[in-house]
Design a protein with these regions (language model features):
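Intrinsic low-complexity, intrinsically disordered segments enriched in polar/basic residues
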Residues: 1, 7-8, 26-32
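Bacterial N-terminal signal peptides that target proteins for export
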Residues: 2-14, 21
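C-terminal segment of classical bacterial N-terminal signal peptides
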Residues: 17-27
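Flexible, solvent-exposed loop/hinge segments and secondary-structure transition points
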Residues: 28-166
Length: 166
């Protein structure tokens, strides 16, 4: 005849053995989340300086903005005598658009003007030339948006900034 006291001791011993066996797994460090490269403020400043140098060299003052990969602004610069007052709104929006769509904003302008006019209904995006993704290796880490006096100038200034980290 088995006593309830013996059963109780057996269950306690089994519970102790199970917890000791599982303890190392419970205490193991959690798996590391892979870190994505991110733009620092210093890198955003480097990008803006390169874009500003191009704008000054060519005589095309404007607004230059750098956003992170989420489209959030890191740094915006309004140069003296910026050609378009609305540039303070347009440049950050172009950077946001290029960051979130992961492509140049010119691609979206071309789509709206071509086979995808419905894209113009995408609220909160600026589908105009002058926004370019910024890459570290093959990873898009942000974008630059520029609003100067012409779309060609916007793109040239943005390209100078986007290439600053290479």
């Amino acid at each position: 005849m088995i006593h309830s006291k013996s059963i109780s001791h057996a269950i306690s011993a089994l519970a102790l053995l199970t917890s000791v066996t599982l303890l190392p797994n419970a205490m193991a460090a959690p798996a590391a989340v892979p870190a994505e490269p991110r733009l620092s403020l210093a890198q955003a400043q480097q990008i803006v300086r390169a874009a500003q140098a191009k704008a000054e060299q060519e005589g095309w003052p404007g607004v230059i903005s750098v956003a992170d990969s989420s489209g959030l602004p890191i740094l915006t610069l309004r140069m003296d005598h910026a050609a378009v007052p609305a540039g303070v709104e347009l440049a950050p929006a172009k950077a946001r658009t290029a960051a979130l769509f992961r492509r140049p904003s010119a691609d979206l302008e071309n789509a709206v003007n071509g086979a995808r006019p419905a894209l113009a209904t995408a609220r909160g995006f600026v589908l105009l030339r002058g926004g370019l993704p910024i890459k570290m290796g093959e990873q898009i880490v942000g974008a630059i948006g520029v609003s100067a006096d012409t779309p060609d100038h916007d793109e040239a200034i943005a390209a100078a900034g986007a290439s600053a980290l290479k």
